[in-house]
Amino acid sequence: MEYKEAIVESMRMLAQQERILFIGQSVRYSGHVMYNTLQDAEVPMEKRIELPVFEDTQMGMSIGLSLAGFLPVSIYPRMDFLIIAANQLVNHLDKMEEMSHGEFNPKMIIRTMVGGRIPLGPGPQHCQDHTSALGLLCPNINVRMLDSTDGVLPSYQEALESPKSSILVEYGDMY
């Protein structure tokens, strides 16, 4: 199985879960390879929430959906864009269980990508890898690098089953 096929199978597996919603940029309309994986996985449109470019608000909406009983897969096409949501990610999602003395524990799956440099580099602001930093900033969130095909489906399965939120980092050059 190729890397993209493993991603597609993972999206298909997630889409079968009743509580799952996919939220972000290019989830209903073409514009990024992550859209293609949702299409190839035949994720129903009613499970997709398209958003404009407002990353911090997207993270807040995803937290709200989680607190309302959904399991959002919040999609950030580039890791560089996820950094814009750091306020909600680091200060709210990661700390909410502690801040609420265990009353609230939102869970979501955050899907992001280190932009590919092949065949044409997108520029330094679209291909940075902040995986290690996110692990340090978010000690209560599982952060996984999807740097091998064999690890893709098990990592998404773990993210689904874990009581904690997860950040899954895909690599564009592996597509």
Regions found by a protein language model. Name each.
Residues M1-Y175:
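Thiamine diphosphate
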